[in-house]
């Protein structure tokens, strides 16, 4: 299959919403600093803005501008780093840069350093994290193939990054970095 990575990066730079394979399902994403793109993503997904989104990245450095690490201990950060890259999402204190649409109007933001090779390439090529939510209409089954994304979301998204999902076959686990509380079973 021919890579369309550059086409996806171009769409992101133009403020468009894209779909891409992750560890367990296809994700929908956009530039986390583009409010119009985030609003479009929420509209496409039919997702309430107070639910928030995940930021997915190639490495921790991409996430740092969106985080306020001052209230996390070295031990708490070590727990987080021990799971990355991988299918583990952590809720951490947000910095002022994190959009309220990404945080769901909370003081925290959900973040993940992906180990999926295409997500790694996409975020590296784009130079920053992406918003991430499962590529499906709210309440519908998550999409696991390009064809399912096309069937469910069709012309509402600009481009789909060609590729296969990882072998997890379910969304990532979500935990609170401060308390370790399990927020979503992975």
Swiss-Prot record:
- The answer to whether keyword Iron applies is no
Q: Which Gene3D superfamilies match?
A: DHBP synthase
Q: What is its main location?
A: cytoplasm
What reaction gets catalysed by this protein?
L-threonine + hydrogencarbonate + ATP = L-threonylcarbamoyladenylate + diphosphate + H2O
Q: Where in the cell is it found?
A: Cytoplasm
Alphabetically ordered keywords of this record: ATP-binding, Cytoplasm, Nucleotide-binding, Nucleotidyltransferase, Transferase, tRNA processing
YrdC-like domain: which residues?
2-186
Sorted alphabetically, which InterPro entries does this protein's record hold? DHBP_synth_RibB-like_a/b_dom, Sua5-like_dom, TC-AMP_synthase, TC-AMP_synthase_SUA5
Assigned EC number? 2.7.7.87
- The EC class name is transferase
Purpose of the protein: Required for the formation of a threonylcarbamoyl group on adenosine at position 37 (t(6)A37) in tRNAs that read codons beginning with adenine. Catalyzes the conversion of L-threonine, HCO(3)(-)/CO(2) and ATP to give threonylcarbamoyl-AMP (TC-AMP) as the acyladenylate intermediate, with the release of diphosphate.
Spell out the HAMAP family in the cross-references: TsaC
Record-stated family: Belongs to the SUA5 family. TsaC subfamily.
Q: What is this protein called?
A: Threonylcarbamoyl-AMP synthase
């Amino acid at each position: 299959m021919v890579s369309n990575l550059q086409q996806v990066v171009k769409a992101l730079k133009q403020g468009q919403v894209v779909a891409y394979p992750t560890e367990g399902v296809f994700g929908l994403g956009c530039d986390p600093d583009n409010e119009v793109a985030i609003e479009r993503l929420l509209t496409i997904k039919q997702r309430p803005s107070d639910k928030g989104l995940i930021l997915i990245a190639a490495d921790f450095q991409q996430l740092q501008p969106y985080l306020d690490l001052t209230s996390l201990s070295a031990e708490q950060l070590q727990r987080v780093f021990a799971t990355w890259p991988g299918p583990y999402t952590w809720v951490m204190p947000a910095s002022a840069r994190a959009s309220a649409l990404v945080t769901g109007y909370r003081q925290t933001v959900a973040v993940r350093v992906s180990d999926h090779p295409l997500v790694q390439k996409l975020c590296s090529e784009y130079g920053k994290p992406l918003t991430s939510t499962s590529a499906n209409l709210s309440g519908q089954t998550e999409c696991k193939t390009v064809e399912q994304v096309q069937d469910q979301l069709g012309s509402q998204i600009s481009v789909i990054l060609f590729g296969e999902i990882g072998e997890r076959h379910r969304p990532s686990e979500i935990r609170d970095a401060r308390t370790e509380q399990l927020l979503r079973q992975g």
